[in-house]
Amino acid sequence: MDLIRSHVMVCGGTNCSSSASGEIIREFERQIAEKGLEKEIKVVRTGCFGMCEAGPVVIVYPEGAFYARMTVENVTRIVDEHLVKGRVVKELLYKEAVDEDNKVKSLDSVDFYKKQRRVALRNCGVIDPENIDEYIAFDGYKALGKVLTEMTPQEVIDVMLKSGLRGRGGAGFPTGMKWKFAAASQSDKKYVCCNADEGDPGAFMDRSILEGDPHVVIEAMAIAAYAIGADQGYIYCRAEAQL
């Protein structure tokens, strides 16, 4: 097994992608391969980190160095100085990512993040959205496993009703009620439909979670399917979404 000493997390969300994050990823991969470091350094395309105004965003672990407004031209400096020599390129860091003593601050100590408690977006910017193993490593599909082995469909619906969870749309309709009505509906065939269409121009709520943590959507749909008696599901999103 290769021992990875550094992870280069590059935002692959819609905003950063429109600012050439794909080219940045390819340039990191090219230069790392040229130096024969591909078994030591892993480049990961992640979902949105949330701070789109600072994009393209690159975070290098284990230091947690938060590089903002990255360009293809700056990749060489980070590879040569940070990844090869172990020296963080502080002048390329986000302005709040260095403290008064000129030390690198953790991401959660930056003002934008320190009061946040991510729930639905907890894995965005943390895992490779296309790698199911990384999702499982962060307790992915654990809830589905519990539902299928320890709970009846009605018990799942009861939990949803008690939770008070509501839809993210304007109506805020209780999710548990939706599942209750769907379960009670008599039909030979039932489906779970995920409406991932952004109703408002310029909105990125649904797109962010689909791009950054698609397995959490699939897991939730599977739980819903079990609760209401469905065996198929569909995700609806617009064709222009670059997922």
Residue ranges and their predicted role:
Residues 1-243:
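Feature of Fe-S/electron-transfer and energy-metabolism proteins
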